[in-house]
Amino acid sequence: MAIRLTHLRKPLAYSRSFDVCIPFFRSISSFEAVEKAIKCAVETKEYLRIPELVVSLKEPYQNSTLFSFLSAFQRHHRIRVIDEILQSFVPVRPRSLPKIVYSSLLTYCLQSSDPLPLSFAILQRTLRSGCLPNPQTHLLLSDAWLERRRGSQSVADIINEMKLIGYSPDTGTCNYLVSSLCAVDKLDEAIKVVEEMSAAGCIPDVESYGAVINSLCLARKTTDVVKIVKEMVSKAGISPRKGMLTKVAAALRANREIWKAIEMIEFVESRDYPVEFESYEVVVEGCLEVREYILAGKVVMRMTDRGFIPYIKVRQKVVERLINIGEWKLACTVRQRVSELRS
């Protein structure tokens, strides 16, 4: 059953009731005292005081214990309170002022017995405020997500639970989940999220694919990365960002799979997306490394068709290797095409 929430759209006015609870909160320095003051602020709905209280600490605490008192609340009450806190921060300027509060709330929720979907709501508000969660969030979020997925729930079903507490899933929140899964080397699950998040109304973008592609390249999972690149340009209709194809080509070169790199470039161009100079350069160098000299010459010809000229050392090496194997005609054609472009 959906939980109805009353969102606070305006900053809360200052109330004298807060002074009754903590008459000298500016002098508070101990963690225990600040925690007690925050609890009082929640009881009196003086949520806008919470960032000041957290900042008053001598050290920037970013852990779950700052809001551990919320565990004593009933689930419905706890969700409502956290929602009210999040909504009260919307008009706060600078938007980064509640950063530590967001971080503490998110850590608390992710370590609770029922972390999702409330953690997604906090994460969404954090990202929309221009803040980034602390690095520990990647591990905690991945653990919480994988625990839910062990129950055989679909990606879309889990993400759509945000709607039950009054929040709409978005691509930015899903992208952070994808990057978290990549950060802990759960690449298969990250791919599933990218492929299925659209069923929850979150359309994958270049950030979604980019996170997975970067991680697959680092892991040299070339078969998977080529598949994802093809899905990105053919199914999603997304143009590769600068450097993306070069990174994939470099991974294929490292695995000595230069034919796959050429096939990938041809596929991307067949969908009318541009391939940058650096990608071609990596492929030519890879051809030379595996002694595919004729192939290197053909790739150089393809480069010149697009107005690209290989670096001088590379093109000289291509011509020399072609001459050495008796491919005089191709060597002369390559040299001529390069000269025409330079003139």
Swiss-Prot record:
The keyword tRNA processing does not apply. Keywords: Repeat. Gene3D superfamilies: Tetratricopeptide repeat domain. The keyword Repeat applies. PPR repeats lie at residues 98-133, 134-169, 170-204, 205-240, 241-275, 276-310. GO terms for cellular component: plastid membrane. It holds the Pfam family PPR_2. Disulfide bonds: none annotated. It comes from the Eukaryota. NCBIfam families: PPR (TIGR00756). Belongs to the PPR family. P subfamily. This is Pentatricopeptide repeat-containing protein At1g06270. It comes from Arabidopsis thaliana (Mouse-ear cress).
